[in-house]
Amino acid sequence: MTDAAQTYERICALALQLPGVELGTSYGTPAIKVKGKLMARLRSEAEGGLALRCDFLERQMLLQAAPEAFYLTPHYKDYPMILIKLDEVRTDALPDLIERAWRMVAPKRLVAAYDAESAPKKKR
């Protein structure tokens, strides 16, 4: 198994820990969705590449901070997505990237329920 394939498996495992996440397809390639909405997909046009939902400000920061791992093509410039080289991205960055992408596409109620469940419980 290649590093890119292992990284994609790790991304799927991380994503599936979040509520409402399901694996599916998009444009004929493996995809990660939340309640049917696209969160990420493997890019068939770039082996080892992943398109991940990402807001524009964070995208600019990622492109500047780690250009070896993050990139953009003209097709994606107007979409809130970042392209990731799976064999170059730092795996310790994945949990936060995945959760932020999930928050962008998950229904507000699902996010609120997740936050309430994840919040530290107060002792009485």
Cite the ranges covered by each PLM segment.
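Charge-dense, helix-prone N-terminal extensions
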Residues: 1-124
